[in-house]
C-alpha cells in the first residue's frame, strides 16, 4: 500500500519544513498529521483522532477551524514552535484532481507580527549570529524586529562574554545560527538563553551584498566588515523565506559600535534589576518600572532601549538632560504633551502591518487618528529652546497628505474583514457610490415588495428574508398556507412550522442585488488595496515621525519621573570622580513611604578614594547602598535626573557586579567556583573607567581562604596600572580594614548600627571607618533561630575572640559542649595531617606568582583550596 494522493502531497510539503508544525488547509480546517498532530493535540488540548492515509495504520490527526487559527498559532508560537501555513492555492470546486497547495508563510517566535500576542512595551527581536572561523575569530550580530522594521548590526572580535551581553541586551525570541557552529559556543549560549534556535545552511550566508542592496537602498557596503555583510544578509534571507513577501518597512540598516554605550553585563543587569525584578521577573520592582511614565507603546519600547544602552558621549547625555530639564520647568507644556501622546496608537507596528499587507481598515483609522495629533505635538515642541527638542520640532513630519487620503477614503466605522465590503467612504469612488445606491434601492424594493405581498395575500405574518444558501425568500407560516397564491409562489424550502417561496420578480431582483453586492465588495477591496499601497510608499516618513514621537515620549516620561520622585539634574563630568550627595536607591525608595528611605553620600574616584571598603552586618544596607551608586550612574548616562540632592557623575564605560551567591548545579559548578569565574571575568574585562561592585568576595570557601582571596583582589584592583577603577567592596572580613593606609585608594566605610536594650537597630547610614563587630548572631536572632542555637553560637564566638587573630585555622580549638569527650584517634590524625600540611606548604612556596595571569592564579588557588578541604 502507498500513501493516498493527498497525503503524498502533505509529505512532500512537510519534507521542506521539518522543523515546523505544518498547518495543512483542508476545506474550513487546518489539519495536522503524524507527529505534528501529537504535539499540537498535547499543546493545544485538542482531540487526537486518525485518518486513512493509504498505509496499514491510520495517520494521527487533529485540526482547528481556519477562522480561529490566529489564537491557536499564537499559543504555539509563544511555546517556541514554528508554524508553516499551507493554504489551498486554487478553488477546490474548479480544480481537477488534488487541490494545489503551498506554504504562504512561516510564523516563528522571532517573526510573529500579531500585536494581540506581542508585548506592546517590548520589542520582538530575531537575531542572527555569524562567527568567522577562517580569519581569526571575528563575529557579527544582527537584530531585527519585523513588527517595527528595526534592523541593528554590530561586530566584535570573538568573546563569548561580549556575545552573551549583547544577546541579553536585545533579549531575542529566536536566534539564527550557522549549521556548523562550534558546539562549545552553542552550549555557552544555550546555558544562558533558553530561546528558539534556528540552524541555517551555509548558503544563507552567501551573496550577502546582493541581498542587502536589494533590501536597503543606497547602502554603502564598503563601510562594513565581511562578517556584518554575511550576518545581515542571512537575517534578511531568513525573514524573506519565512514571510514570503518583501517588507518595505525594514529599510534602515543601523550599525552600532558596542563601545559607544555603557556595557552592563548579564549578572549586573540581573543583580541591579534594571528592566525586571530578580524575584518575579516583572517590570514592577525594576528601574524601568520606576521611571517608565510613557504614554505610548513606542515610547515604552524606546525607553527600554535607552536603559539597555546608556550613553557614554557626554554631549548626547547633556542634550537629553537639558531637554528633560526644560520639559520639567514648563509644567503646562509637559501636561499638554502628556495629553497629546495619550491618544497615539502604535504607529511603528501599524507601519509594519501596512508594509506586510496585513493591515485592516480599522487599523488604518488608528493611524489616521494618531496622525491627527501630530500637529498638536509640533505646536508644543515649537515652544522649547534646547537643541534636541528644537531638532525634533524641525524634523517632525505632520503627514498631512496621508491623513487627508485616509480621511477621504476609509469609513469611520469600517468592517474588520476586507472581504465583506463596508470599507470605503461615499465620494471616494463614483462606481462604488453607484453600486451602494443600487444596493440600498434594491433593499428598499424588497421592503416594498414585502408590504405589497402582505396586502395581496392578506397574510400579515408574511416576511421576506435572506440567507447565503437560498438567497432571498418569502416565508409563510403553516397556519397561513391556504392563503398562498400557488400560481405565483414557487416552493423553495420546507421548515417545521413554515414554508419558504420565491417569485420570478423576487429572483430577478435578487440577481441584481447580489450582483451589485458582489461587485461592490470587489471594488471596495480594490480601492482599499489602492489606499494601502499609497500609504505604504510613505512608510519611511511614517517611521521617522514615529521615532521622534517615541523620543518625545521618553523625555516626557523622564521629566514626569523626576517631578514625582524629587530627582535632581546630575552634572556630567570628564573627571574620574563620582560624588553623590544624599543619594537614594530609586526602586527601594519607591516601595517605601515618603521620607522612610535613608539617603547616603558617595565620594569615589580613581585616586585616594578608589576602593570603598564597606563593612557591617547583613541586612544593614550594604548591598542596597552599592546598587544605588550603580543605578544613579546608569540613570545619569541615559539622560535621566537622579535620586539625590545633588550629583556629579563621571562617565563610566562598564559596570560589573559580583553580588549574591548561587550554585550552578546544572554545570557542576559550586558557589565558590561560580564566584571565582565571575571575579575573573571582572578583572579581565574592567578598565580604569569602569565601576565595580563586589559583595562578599571569598565567602564561598573557608574563612582564611576567602580572606586571602579578597585581600589579593583588592590589591590587584588598586595596584594594576591598567585597572585602578572605581570599586565598592562590601565584606565581612574585618581584617581587610587594615588595608587603609597600606594600599593607596582604599578607604574604610561601615553601616552604622545602634544597640538598644540588647537589640540592634540598623540605621542604614554609611559612615567613615570600619565596623567593630558583625552582629551576625543578632541578625540570626531577628531571623528567629532557636535560643539554644543562639546560646551555643555566643559560646563559640567568645572562645574565638579570645584567641590570637594570627593563629591558623588548623590550630584553632573550638570550645566543646559540656560532657563532650575527645576521640582516641585524634592524635594519629594530627600526625598524618602534619605531613599533608608540609607538602602543601612546599607546593605553595614554589608558586611563581609574578609570572601568572589572574585566571591562572585563581585556578591554582582553587586547586590548593580543594587540597586544604581534603586534609
Curated annotation (Swiss-Prot):
Family named by the database record: Belongs to the DNA mismatch repair MutS family.
Protein name (Swiss-Prot/TrEMBL): DNA mismatch repair protein MutS
UniProt keyword NAD, yes or no: no
Role, per record: This protein is involved in the repair of mismatches in DNA. It is possible that it carries out the mismatch recognition step. This protein has a weak ATPase activity.
GO molecular function, one term: mismatched DNA binding
BP-aspect Gene Ontology terms: mismatch repair
Ranges where the record places region Disordered: 801-825
Binding site for ATP: 616-623
Alphabetic keyword roster: ATP-binding, DNA damage, DNA repair, DNA-binding, Nucleotide-binding
Gene3D superfamilies for this protein: 1.10.1420.10, DNA repair protein MutS, domain I, MutS, connector domain, P-loop containing nucleotide triphosphate hydrolases
Superkingdom as given in the UniProt entry: Bacteria
Organism of origin: Clostridium kluyveri (strain ATCC 8527 / DSM 555 / NBRC 12016 / NCIMB 10680 / K1)
A GO CC term attached to the entry: cytosol
The keyword Nucleotide-binding is annotated on this UniProt entry: yes
PROSITE patterns from the UniProt entry: DNA_MISMATCH_REPAIR_2
InterPro entries hit by this protein: DNA_mismatch_repair_MutS, DNA_mismatch_repair_MutS-lik_N, DNA_mismatch_repair_MutS/MSH, DNA_mismatch_repair_MutS_C, DNA_mismatch_repair_MutS_clamp, DNA_mismatch_repair_MutS_core, DNA_mismatch_repair_MutS_N, DNA_mismatch_repair_MutS_sf
